[in-house]
A protein has these predicted regions:
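Macromolecular interaction modules
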Residues: 1-114
Length: 114
């Protein structure tokens, strides 16, 4: 079976950032990891960057990119349609205390190359 990754990216209101990180790490990810077909979850935070190309070191504009990204490795796209997934994303404080304060939300599903 092919593996897939779901990439979920978003920003959070600054006054809710500590709660966002706490809930994501202690409630949201553990709930998602209990969903059949979910293999792994990793979180990332964007950083400013410079890159050398065209013979020059340049500042890269990442201002439109969401601050936080989570990468969910899953068995297949059908995992995202299960009742278990639906239940997991509504668990704990996420739906009422965190989700309303997120913005610039982006989701993309990618099939891993074999």
């Amino acid at each position: 079976m092919s593996k897939y990754i779901l990439i979920a990216s978003m920003d959070i209101d600054p006054e809710k950032e500590d709660l966002f990180n706490e809930v994501y790490d202690t409630e949201h990810i553990p709930a998602i990891l209990n969903v059949p077909g979910v293999i792994n979850v990793e979180r990332l935070k964007s950083q400013t960057m410079k890159m050398n190309f065209g013979g020059q070191v340049r500042d890269m504009d990442t201002s439109q990119e969401p601050t936080y990204t989570a990468i969910y490795r899953i068995e297949g796209p059908e995992v995202l349609e299960t009742s278990e997934w639906g239940k997991a994303v509504e668990t704990g404080r996420w739906p009422d205390e965190v989700r309303p304060y997120t913005s610039n939300r982006q989701f993309v599903l990618r099939k891993m190359m074999e």
